[in-house]
């Protein structure tokens, strides 16, 4: 991982090179897995057509780049749900995503595909042979007794037997909430009692509201993200940017965003920087390995007898980006084989 000083030096170097390097004009999609600006627009048009949660944006006019149309400076999808933190996936296999990418280890810049969590030996130990299970012919004892309905006599014991007869049917009284204040019909309460009860109930509701989030850990805290895709002139690939909100629509802090990044990529391939078209801080996935990964996927398509299409580039791209942000559920649903 680069230090802050190294990152600053690298950014300055990239900006300098971008200014003097001509924009890619010849397609190298099949040879190198990169895009020209025109191919980026073509791929973005298909993405916005097939997945209408994505839109083209113009951004700040003062930050527009000349090699892209003014109304198509970058792609954006808003309010993308993120229901879980990455740490909650500890027992869920992500092999279906990890298998999509096999990149050779080229040192610090190599792309890391997360491995399924858990010990395979433990999984094997939990398997049970159904043939070894024994079935007991004995009927289990039950606490419910069935009795004949009482005749015309009014013996008090029969009342108890009636209760046993309906033992399996829950009584409404069983659902009595211990926190309910009103034990009597409010319509018959005196004026003083009604005032006291109302005040107490209001205080109780206020306390419940204050403690609701703290006391109930089962509440689903849904974060949302705005995700944008820009064209990176230096790397000649798309670059993904993330801006997150908590359940109260407050912007997430950088350390909170990293909770939604794959452990193998947080602080390594994901860093914080100013968005090139908006001028505010976003987290972004570093594009240094994007071309190599895309070249792998394009080659795999060719090996499987499929003709790679440059306009489908972003669907392949977003598919492998999901390895980095596995719990952020953005749309990239287009059926094709890789």
UniProtKB/Swiss-Prot annotation:
Compositionally biased tracts (Acidic residues): 158-186
Protein task: E2 conjugating enzyme required for the cytoplasm to vacuole transport (Cvt), and autophagy. Responsible for the E2-like covalent binding of phosphatidylethanolamine to the C-terminal Gly of atg8. The atg12-atg5 conjugate plays a role of an E3 and promotes the transfer of atg8 from atg3 to phosphatidylethanolamine (PE). This step is required for the membrane association of atg8. The formation of the atg8-phosphatidylethanolamine conjugates is essential for autophagy and for the cytoplasm to vacuole transport (Cvt).
Cellular component aspect of the GO annotation: cytosol; phagophore assembly site
Region annotated Disordered, chain positions: 91-215
Family matches, as InterPro entries: Atg3/Atg10
Keyword entries, A-Z: Autophagy, Cytoplasm, Protein transport, Transport, Ubl conjugation, Ubl conjugation pathway
MF (Gene Ontology): Atg8-family conjugating enzyme activity
Alphabetical GO biological process terms: autophagosome assembly; autophagy of mitochondrion; glycophagy; nucleophagy; protein transport
PANTHER family: UBIQUITIN-LIKE-CONJUGATING ENZYME ATG3
Bias type Basic and acidic residues, positions: 91-100
Active-site residues, record numbering mapped to chain: 288
Complex formation: Interacts with atg7 and atg12. The complex composed of atg3 and atg7 plays a role in the conjugation of atg12 to atg5.
Protein name from the UniProt record: Autophagy-related protein 3
Low complexity: compositionally biased ranges: 141-157, 192-210
Keyword field contains Transferase: no
